[in-house]
Curated annotation (Swiss-Prot):
It is an enzyme of class 2 (transferase). Keywords: Cytoplasm, Methyltransferase, rRNA processing, S-adenosyl-L-methionine, Transferase. Belongs to the methyltransferase superfamily. METTL16/RlmF family. This is Ribosomal RNA large subunit methyltransferase F. Its EC number is 2.1.1.181. GO terms for molecular function: 23S rRNA (adenine(1618)-N(6))-methyltransferase activity. It is found in: Cytoplasm. The keyword Cytoplasm applies. It comes from the Bacteria. SUPFAM superfamilies: S-adenosyl-L-methionine-dependent methyltransferases. One of its GO terms (biological process) is rRNA base methylation. InterPro entries: METTL16/RlmF, rRNA_lsu_MeTfrase_F, SAM-dependent_MTases_sf. It catalyses: adenosine(1618) in 23S rRNA + S-adenosyl-L-methionine = N(6)-methyladenosine(1618) in 23S rRNA + S-adenosyl-L-homocysteine + H(+).
Amino acid sequence: MLSYAPENAYQRASTMENKKVFPKEKSGLHPRNRHRSRYDFDALSVSCPELIPFLAPTAYGDISVDFADPLAVKMLNKALLKHFYGIEYWDIPADSLCPPIPGRADYVHHLADLLASCNGEVIPKGKNIALLDIGVGANCIYPIIGQREYGWRFTGTDIDSHALSAAKMVVSMNPTLKNTLRLKQQKDPHAIFEGVWAVNERYDATLCNPPFHGSAEEAAATTRRKLHKLGKNEVAAKPVQNFGGKNSELWCEGGEEGFVSRMVAESVAKAQNCFWFTSLISKKTTLPAIYHALRYVKAVEVRTIEMAQGQKVSRFVAWTFLTPEQQAAWVAERWA
């Protein structure tokens, strides 16, 4: 065991009668997800000593971080990215989204399985596989995971110039990302693909974590509920997001349903330039509207991939305009 400050507290806490036994693995995560096991804070602290001041014993006698503290969550992410993905430098502005990495990794792995399902169950790997990350943010989570696990190259877009500046610093400070992640600013806040997707560009898949809420008030109310569940009974009228997030990352007009519906509409113009369009869908109630939009644009194939992280269930919807014959030609040309 590491000799860090909380160790004595840990030893005392471990003798508590209310010591709780947790399962060794988190239920529901993808088999290839590196985060299936419970966090090994000893190992993470070796990789990232900056994490140590944020470690403390829980009421159940375990060591953890305060997930209601944005700085603690940010430092945990920094440690995870360094320990599992070899990211030496990672920093984001204080008000940027700091996503839970296990769930983001699940999206990437299930997306890899989606591609494999069209390639004889073999995951296409390497720099020839190009993905478009809509809303890459300052954190660059999807490109970091996709490059490390499968060698894919990414184009990341965002409307926030400050987020992109932070993302560019992450890219410049990590050699593995320099030639595998290209960043573009979406200058039209009402557009998704238009303006950042050149006519001759082809992508094997797109991915997106769309803004969840329809207003700033709705986003704040959700944060208050989350903090209450984490045991923070006194919550401010404008609470600080424990996972951060600027307005453009958390809400937009029409919320998740409106954003993804616009994405579906725009995807028609790129129908022959992409194999699979995909987007996370957090609300199950959003699905009927998205299915309706996909029927309207006559998508050839639509799939819904369910994912689970413990008790939380999410999914992403994938659609393609390529016929089976066109899919086979795409695979032969780009994935062989």
